[in-house]
Amino acid sequence: MRLAILDYGLFEVYANGRRIGIPGYYIESGDRRILVDTGFHRDYLADPLGVCLSDGLGAFGRLIEYTDMQNPTAQLGLLGVSPSDITDLVLTHGHVDHVGRIDEFPQATLYVSAVERARPTPIYWNGQSRIAWPANQTVTVDAPTDIVPGICLVPTPGHTMGHLSLVLTLPAFGTVILAADAISRPDELADDRYADAEDPNAARQSAHMLRQRAIQDAAWLVYGHCPQQWQCMRRAPYWYD
């Protein structure tokens, strides 16, 4: 099994000037080719500021880096993988920076939480969505679920009530926890504040659970949008294995 970290762009948060990487993840295990999250919608490539405004993101921040290399197809290409190779597509949650290109992998089995999939469309942003649920074969998750041995989807409600994180065990590197937005950055744990969460109390419980799991398993805890960690991580075409 091996893991690659994908670069889906850079976003600036107006409130604090924080510049956050937009990650995706690709995992190979045996004959399975697993993509986790898909970044922003392709419309952002032509007009990032205009689409930010029309999607209601304009009051929150702006996409400051989004090139034709910062999408799933291009990032997978760095690894010698084509979109048609993807067997499984995991959606951690339905926000705008995670769900934008889920329609580009029609052959893949989609893994999404039951709570998230029960929404008429992905939550996207501010209750408006330019994304529909794809017609993929879909597995809905409401409890810890192994995709394959060594890759477990873990419900982590709070940021959204259908949020999923992943726990995987790499043969040499060891255990990795992909928290996604269940823990965006370590400040959330240090301050014990989850102000952007759909349910802050549930978010707190999920974050504490993941932290305890990381301590217990001596795991690498990968945050969803930590500027410092983002600068230090190896990204595609490099691997963790």
Could you say what each language-model-derived stretch is?
Residues 4-6, 34, 90, 111, ...:
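Hydrophobic/aromatic beta-strand patches that form the interior of the parallel beta-sheet core
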Residues 17-20, 157-161:
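A short catalytic or substrate-binding loop motif that flags glycine-/basic-rich loops and adjacent residues
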Residues 41, 52, 64-81, 85-97, 104, 112-155, ...:
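Metallo-beta-lactamase
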